[in-house]
Amino acid sequence: IVFDELNMIDEVKGAEFAIMSPVGYSGRNRTAKNARWLYGIAVDLDGVEMEQLRDVFHQMKHDFLPQCTYCVNSGHGLHLYYLFEKPVPLYRHLQDQLREFKYELIRKIWNRYTSTYTEREQVQYQGIFQGFRMVGTQSKLGKRYPVTAFETGERVTVEYLNGFLMDDSKAVTDFKYKSDLSLAEAKKKYPESVSYTH
């Protein structure tokens, strides 16, 4: 379990198997019910050889695909991380919308130029809670080949990613980002809206 201090991340370096998703939870269990914040979207792209890797970045450079924040080498494939400028709340009504949004993004990213897996049934659609091997841990290739991350872009917004969807009906628009206001600032700015607990 990783808490806000993130100190557990250093402790898993070199571990044989440790996964994490870009989701913040309340409570000790990693369940949809306990999910509070989505910090980004991680897309698993398999069947990537040098030709496909070049094409992934070519498509990003020419705005056919969204520019990822981090590209992670996971052994036989890539994990493309699109970290958000601000976390998105994981209200229950948004979870299904965000899953469909991610599926549509995967459909765009996983194409005949970015993967050797060219059949639609070979595409792997993972939900928003899917965890992947952590950077610094062992890849499927063993301890001599740790999972490695490369910073490839800036943090993104949901609105930016919406612009790359092939089906506009999958765009996520009805939500508010996490506020930068502290509780004290919110009470001062919105005294009638912020409830006080004693």
Label every model-predicted segment.
Residues 1-78, 84-100, 104:
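Signature for HUH/AEP ssDNA processing cores
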Residues 113-190:
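Catalytic "initiation/cleavage/transfer" segments centered on a nucleophilic residue
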Residues 193-194:
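Short, compositionally biased segments
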